[in-house]
Curated annotation (Swiss-Prot):
CC annotations in GO: ribonucleoprotein complex; ribosome
Protein name: Large ribosomal subunit protein bL9
Coiled coil: none
Keywords, sorted A to Z: Ribonucleoprotein, Ribosomal protein, RNA-binding, rRNA-binding
GO process annotations (BP): translation
Name of the gene: rplI
Length: 152
């Protein structure tokens, strides 16, 4: 009996791997838990071909997402500057601060494309003026945008 068997996971298993991963486990773990509950399948040439096909599809999808992020970065740079209006007091000091939600709203208004506010890094802004904000569009693509904060 082999000390380890190779299997392909059908779902994410916290201590083992993600869906589609090729892993080596103890034969008893595979035979008594993973295989009977449909959480994995034994590695065969046909299954290996399916895994390679799935990986190629995923790589293609990731490349398309990256290209979309690069295109959006270009669109952001052509717009140039985004404006956020906030209530101000004396000496152009803001009541409150400019949040990443405010910046996301300004971007959505200008581009008509929704962006997650958690992907926006805003420096501490307590006065009116011009600032640089970082937007993470993809794991490999970030954009620097110019933000103008004006008072009313």
């Amino acid at each position: 009996m082999p000390k380890r068997v190779q299997i392909v996971l059908n779902e994410d298993i916290l201590s083992l791997g993600m869906d589609g991963d090729l892993v080596e486990v103890a034969p008893g773990y595979a035979r008594n838990f993973l295989l009977p509950f449909g959480k994995a399948v034994p590695l065969t040439p046909a299954v290996m071909k399916q895994v390679e096909h799935r990986r190629a599809k995923e790589a293609e999808r990731q490349a398309a997402l990256k290209q979309e992020a690069v295109d959006f970065k270009t669109a952001l740079s052509t717009i140039g500057r985004f404006t956020v209006k906030k209530q101000t007091g004396e000496d152009n000091v803001l009541f409150g601060t400019v949040t990443n939600g405010d910046v996301a709203e300004a971007i959505e208004t200008a581009t008509k494309k929704e962006i997650d506010r958690r992907d926006i890094v805003v420096p501490e802004i307590h006065r009116t003026g011009k600032y640089t904000v970082t937007v993470k569009l993809h794991s490999e693509v970030t954009a620097e945008i110019n933000l103008e904060v004006v008072g009313y």
